[in-house]
Amino acid sequence: MSDQTATTSTPFPAPAKPAPAAARTKLILEGPIFSTLLRLSAPNVLNLLAFAGMVTFDGFFLGRLGSDALAGASLVFPWVMLVLQSTNSGMGAGVSSAVARAIGAGKSERANALVFHAFLLALALGAIFAGLMLLGGPTLFRLMGGQDDMLDAALAYAYVALGGAAAICLLNFMGNAVRGTGNMALPAGVLVACVLAHIAISPILIFGFGPLPPLGAAGAAWGLVLPFAVGGAWFVWYLHSGRALVRLTFRGMAPRWELFADILKVGVPGLVNTAFTNLSVVVLTGISARMGRDIAIGYAMGARLEYIMQPLAFGFGTAILAMVGTNWGARQYARARAIAVIGVTTVATVCGSIGIIVAIFPALWLGLFSDDPDVFRVGGLYLHIVAPFYLCFGMGLGLFFVSQGLGRGTAAAAANGVRLGVNVVGGLIAVYWLDLGMTGFFASVAVGFAVYAALLAWAVARVKEPGIAVAATA
C-alpha cells in the first residue's frame, strides 16, 4: 500500500493515509530476507542518484569558474558532507534506530515522543555547525592550505552552505524518523526533489541569469540550502499532520533526557564515525594541497567518488538498519544476524564492483570534472591504488549500519578512528619520512579501508544476545 499520492500543488509528494503499521512491520519481521532488503532499498536508489547528481554537478559547475574556485570548494566540501552525512547516516540514523526499536517493541507513544526530541536535536545541531564554521572558517581553511582566490572561494561557499546547516539537519532528522517506520520511499522522494531543485537553480545562482547577478561559489551553496529548507519544512508539516506512522506533536511534550539518550547512544557514535570519515578527507586534502594545487585537485576528484560510495551504502544501509533494529527489538536475534550477513555482503559486492571499474578506467570518473593532464595523472594514480579497496570500504559501511540497528554504534566510531589514524599517520610517514610521494600517500588510504572493515567485522561478530554491547564498546 502506498504511503503517498501525487499532487500538483506542491513540489513534494502529498501524503495520503498511511498503510497499517502491522503490514510493513510484519514484512520486516517475517518476510524473505533478501527480497525484503531489496524492496526496502529500492526507493533509496533515488538517494544514490540524488547524491551522485549533487556531487557530480557541483564539481562540474564550479570547475567552469576556474581552478581556484574548484580548489576552494574542495576545501569546504568535506565539511558540507560532514553535515549531510552526520545528520543522515550518523545522528539521523540514531533517530531511525530509536524509532525502529520502539515500533518493534510495540511502543507507539514512545516512538512519537522520539520524533519530538529529534526535532529539538536537529535545531540544536544545526546551530552548532553554523556557529563553529562562521567563527572558525577562515583559520581552518588557511590551515588546510587555502590562500588568495582559493581561500576567498572557500569562504564564500562555506558561509552560506554551513550557515544554513539547520535546514540540512531538519530535513535529515525528520526523514530518518519516517525511515524508522520502514517507509523508505517517501524520504527518498523528498530528497530527490530537493537535489533536483539544487541542480536546477545552482547554475543560475552561480553564473547569473537575467537580472540575477552571478554569485560564484556562493551560488552553489545557496542552491543547496534553499531546497533543503523547503524540504525540511515539508517534513515537519507531514509528521505533524498525523499522516505518518509516527507523529510530531508539541502539545504536552517536554524534553526528557531518557529519550535524548536513546537517540544519542547511537547518534553520537554515528556522528563521531562520520566525523572521522570526513576528517580523513579534510586532513588528506590539506596534505595534498601543500604538495601542490594540481595534486590537491587530483586527489579531491578521486576521493570525491567515495562520497558516492557512502550514499550507495546508505541506500541499502537504511533498510539494513530498520530490519536489524526491528528484529532485534522483537528479540528475533538469529534473523537479525542473518539480515546483517546478507546486507553487508550486498553492499560490499556493489561497492567493490564499482571500485574495480574505475580502477581500470579512471577517465570515466575524472573526465567529468577536468581535462587537465596533471589532474588526470594524480587522480588516475589514486583510483588505481585505492579503488580496488572499495570492497573493504563497502563492507565497513554495511557493518556500520548493522551496529546502529543493534543500538551499538561505538565500535563503528572506534574502527573509523583507527582508519583515520592509519590514513593520516601513514600518509605523513610515506610522504615526509619514507619519501614515497603520492604512491605511498595513496597506499595509506587503501590500507585504512582494509583495517576499517576488519575491525568492524570483529566487533560486530562479538555482539551478544540479548543486546549486550560488543566487548570493545563496554
Question: What positions do the PLM features span?
Answer:
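Short runs within selected transmembrane alpha-helices of multi-pass transporters and secretion channels
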Residues: 92, 96, 160-180, 187-195, ...
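Short alpha-helical transmembrane segments in multi-pass integral membrane proteins
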Residues: 1-44, 99-166, 197-204, 212-268, ...
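Residue-level hotspots within pore-lining transmembrane alpha-helices
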Residues: 46, 50, 54, 83, ...
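Alpha-helical transmembrane segments of multipass membrane proteins
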Residues: 56-60, 82, 131, 139, ...
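Interfacial/gating helices of multi-pass transporter permease domains
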Residues: 39, 62-81, 149-156, 217-218, ...
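Helix-terminus/linker motif at the lipid-water interface of multi-pass membrane proteins
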Residues: 45, 49-71, 141-148, 204-215, ...
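Small-residue-rich hydrophobic transmembrane alpha-helices
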Residues: 70-131, 168-182, 186-187, 298-362, ...
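Transmembrane helical elements of multi-pass membrane transporters/channels
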Residues: 39-58, 160, 227-231, 235, ...
